[in-house]
Amino acid sequence: MIQRRTLLSATAVAPLAALTGCASQNLAGYASEKPVLDLTQYFNGTVDAHGIFQGRSGQIARRFTVVMECSWKGNEGVLDEAFTYSDGTTQRRIWRLTKHADGHYTGTADDVVGTARGQTQGNAFRWGYTLALPVDGKVYHVDFDDWMYL
């Protein structure tokens, strides 16, 4: 039997200074929230997610749905994401994740600059990374503050 799970995601696009110094959410504030999000268990099989992109002002810039095919071998995971955006465009991203002994996660994908870093607390996961976004023949490096909630 195939299990499908649903996840909510809110992604804020922000300059790096806003990511590190002015974030309005605090991951520790979710520490007592239930159920606890264990990425290696939750992201195993097919996961449906719905999300938004928000600009620095908090205004919704774009909506999306994503179907993820996920698997883990030990502390190494693969999330194969198929996005459909509100304007009808589609995109695919394959994350390669590592769960570290101290509980944080790192990950890479073809359009991610460097290494993504994240951590869970309670029912929330905060994931920070820089994405290489092609726009009109140019590539922009945009910092993402990606939050996922059960």
Protein language model features and the residues they cover:
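N-terminal export leaders
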Residues: 3-11
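N-terminal helix-cap/turn-to-beta initiation motif at the start of protein domains
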Residues: 30-46
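Central antiparallel beta-sheet cores of small beta-barrel/beta-sandwich binding domains
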Residues: 50, 54-135, 141, 145-147
